[in-house]
């Protein structure tokens, strides 16, 4: 592969770094976003993701960009994303067909909205519950970058778990990680900026017996392209911000605004969820996903898909002032409309 294109400008870094025989599985950014919406909407219930549900979510995401499908087609890796984007649950099972014992993304999602009979009644949320992680969340999100990068920017609800922690001789895993390791209906998701660190950490953990582990495909770089707002708190690093398209005129930079540090934020606000849903609509298109959660959202049907995907403004059809019934009405989701 050449180092630079014909015009001599440096060649952009690839968004995905697929390798053959990857030990870990991958979860698409769009699938992760769907899982986030479900978990946030049903946060007052015991959540469990099943492989079948993830498969359905991934299938509903099958209309994602052709570029992603082309990349997946070129890889023989075990963790390559499927051309179909089922539900988050589908995604997990579809990539590892022979592993019946491991917790798949599908298994995690299919149980969303159902009470865990063994655990009895649903836990009542304390007044300060919004400052805490979602109870019984079906996924554990780990940021494997260094602590400074985490404090500058991270996905809402992620825990800081620098990759160097894996090198510890004693106690390399927190209690949360041990609780989620290979637990039924639970998965662990690792991410970084561009898959460099996350792929190493995921490989190491899989070699140490983690069977329900996933890597966020494309990392923050792809996440920033598809979801410029909503999923992240803080200021994205320059390496994750989308470059100008070839031939476009670069505007003279204005005064540089100071980068805002990440908040100690564990839950998504209603505004965050609205933005995530709108970017999902822009990426997939409501007509291509009749089984998606927002199929009955009248505002979503009026959505206008912007020309550019990365770094775009919020789609013009996105509701900004009124409540989104799909996001905030947990009763609607309890019926599992994605089935």
From Swiss-Prot:
Compositional bias, Low complexity, is annotated for: 62-73
Cross-referenced SUPFAM superfamilies: Rhodanese/Cell cycle control phosphatase
Record organism: Rattus norvegicus (Rat)
Task: Identify the stretch(es) annotated as Disordered.
Answer: 56-99, 283-339
Extent of Polar residues compositional bias: 82-99, 286-299, 313-332
Predominant location category: cytoplasm
Question: Where would I find the Rhodanese domain in this sequence?
Answer: 135-232
Purpose of the protein: Required during ciliogenesis for tubulin glutamylation in cilium. Probably acts by participating in the transport of TTLL6, a tubulin polyglutamylase, between the basal body and the cilium.
Recorded hits in Pfam families, A to Z, give: Rhodanese
In terms of superkingdom, the source organism counts as Eukaryota
Omega-N-methylarginine, modified sites? 309
Q: Where in the cell is it found?
A: Cytoplasm, Cytoskeleton, Microtubule organizing center, Centrosome; Cell projection, Cilium; Cytoplasm, Cytoskeleton, Cilium basal body
Q: Which Gene3D superfamilies match?
A: Rhodanese-like domain
- By what name is this protein known? Centrosomal protein of 41 kDa
The UniProt keywords, alphabetically, are: Cell projection, Ciliopathy, Cilium, Cilium biogenesis/degradation, Cytoplasm, Cytoskeleton, Methylation, Phosphoprotein, Protein transport, Transport
Can you cite an annotated GO cellular component? Answer: ciliary basal body
By sequence similarity, the record places it as follows: Belongs to the CEP41 family.
> In Gene Ontology terms, what is a biological process of this protein?
cilium assembly
Location of Phosphothreonine modifications: 75
List, alphabetically, the InterPro entries matched.
CEP41, Rhodanese-like_dom, Rhodanese-like_dom_sf
Phosphoserine, modified sites: 62, 65, 80, 87
Q: What does the record note on quaternary structure?
A: Found in a complex with TTLL6.
């Amino acid at each position: 592969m050449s180092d630079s294109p014909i015009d001599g400008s440096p060649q952009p870094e690839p968004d995905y770094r697929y390798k053959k025989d990857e030990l870990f599985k991958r979860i698409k950014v769009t699938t992760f976003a769907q899982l986030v919406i479900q978990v946030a909407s049903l946060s007052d219930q015991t959540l469990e993701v099943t492989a079948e549900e993830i498969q359905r979510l991934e299938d509903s995401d099958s209309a994602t960009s052709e570029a992603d499908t082309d990349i997946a087609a070129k890889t023989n890796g075990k963790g390559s994303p499927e051309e179909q984007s089922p539900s988050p649950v589908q995604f997990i099972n579809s990539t590892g067909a022979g592993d019946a014992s491991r917790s798949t993304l599908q298994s995690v999602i299919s149980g969303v909205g159902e009470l865990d009979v063994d655990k009895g009644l649903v836990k009542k949320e304390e007044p300060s519950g919004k400052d805490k992680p979602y109870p019984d969340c079906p996924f554990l999100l780990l940021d494997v970058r260094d602590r400074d990068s985490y404090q500058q920017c991270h996905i809402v609800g992620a825990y800081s778990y620098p990759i160097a922690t894996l090198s510890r001789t004693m106690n390399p895993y927190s209690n949360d990680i041990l609780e989620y390791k290979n637990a039924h209906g639970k998965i662990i998701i690792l991410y970084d900026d561009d898959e460099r660190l996350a792929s190493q950490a995921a490989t190491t953990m899989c070699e140490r017996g983690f069977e329900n582990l996933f890597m966020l495909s494309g990392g923050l770089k792809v996440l920033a392209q598809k979801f410029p707002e909503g999923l992240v708190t803080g200021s994205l690093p320059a390496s994750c911000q989308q470059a100008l398209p070839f031939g476009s005129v670069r505007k003279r930079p204005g005064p540089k605004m100071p980068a805002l540090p990440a908040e100690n934020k564990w839950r998504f606000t209603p505004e965050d969820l609205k933005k995530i849903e709108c970017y999902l609509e822009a990426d997939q298109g409501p007509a291509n996903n009749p089984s998606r959660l927002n199929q009955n959202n009248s505002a979503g049907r009026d959505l206008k898909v912007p020309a550019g995907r990365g770094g775009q403004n919020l789609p013009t059809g996105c509701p900004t002032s009124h409540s989104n019934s799909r996001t905030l009405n947990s009763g609607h989701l309890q019926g599992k409309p994605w089935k």
